[in-house]
Design a protein with these regions (language model features):
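Phosphate-binding P-loop
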Residues: 7, 30-37
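Short acidic, S/G/P-rich loop/turn micro-motifs used as interaction or catalytic elements
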Residues: 46-49, 72-76, 106-111, 133-135, ...
């Protein structure tokens, strides 16, 4: 497991800085999951797969496979926006060896029983279960405790800190100057892209890439995505005014 201070900091961002007990329980649950003694259970509103993916990167590392078992999405390669997926449980298990396998409790595969049997017999795959139902908030009597991700609507006092930390991550990842994310960008993310942690992470990274690249093609290349995809993302949003003046032509 990575340095506890780094992981604790990320979990506090995800669960809330004011809830130290939730962070302590999450660290224990992650330890059990990484030792393959239990599945990691995430509970909360919305799509929790991006959070499971982020936890995977912070624990096992981005170079290890992260596979979503999703009969609806089918077999897809990983992209900058989405992790790789497989339609069947067994196929997902085989692709996830050495890494993590993620399943949504409401989209279990037809061969789920076979998947469970495989997981019980291996120490090579970490299993993460995303459950839309909010778990009982009382302290559990047994471990592992689920990681209950509170909605951002309940964390308005922490929203600015969340945005700032994701912006710092983006600046570090892209080796950008601190000026790559401005107070205007921060206000824009707060107003237009703060529905979820995943939205904030995506928006801060893309804004930093756009602001610190010569053109849209350069930003897309640094993000590892197609320029047409980044252009569509921009087309659905009104950018911060200062960015429009600095990047009047995104070609």
């Amino acid at each position: 497991m990575p340095a506890s201070d780094e992981l604790r900091s990320f979990l506090a961002r995800m669960l809330g800085w004011s809830d130290e007990r939730a962070v302590d329980l999450a660290l224990r649950s992650l330890s059990l999951a990484l030792d393959h003694r239990a599945a990691l259970v995430l509970c909360g509103e919305g799509d929790l797969v991006p959070i499971a993916w982020a936890l995977h990167r912070h624990t096992l590392g981005a170079d290890r496979p992260f596979i979503v078992c999703d009969p609806r999405r089918g077999t897809k390669a990983a992209s900058v926006r989405s992790p790789a997926s497989r339609a069947s449980g067994v196929a997902a298990f085989e692709a996830a060896i050495g890494g993590s396998l993620c399943v949504r409790s409401r989209r279990l595969p037809g061969d789920f029983s076979a998947l469970v049997a495989r997981l019980r017999d291996t120490d090579d795959v970490l299993c993460a279960i995303c459950n839309a139902e909010i778990a009982d908030p009382r302290p559990p009597l047994v471990l592992p405790a689920p990681l209950v991700v509170p909605p951002l609507a309940q964390r308005s006092a922490e929203l600015d800190r969340i945005i700032a930390e994701y912006a710092n991550d983006a600046i570090e990842e892209l080796a950008a100057p601190a000026s790559g994310f401005t107070p205007g960008d921060h206000a824009w993310v707060r107003a237009h892209a703060a529905a979820s942690l995943a939205d904030i992470e995506k928006a801060t990274l893309r804004l930093v890439a756009i602001r610190t690249s010569r053109n849209l093609s350069g930003a897309a290349a640094r993000l590892g995505m197609a320029v047409v995809s980044l252009s569509r993302w921009l087309g659905r949003r009104k950018l911060p005014p200062t960015m429009l003046s600095d990047h009047g032509s995104h070609r």
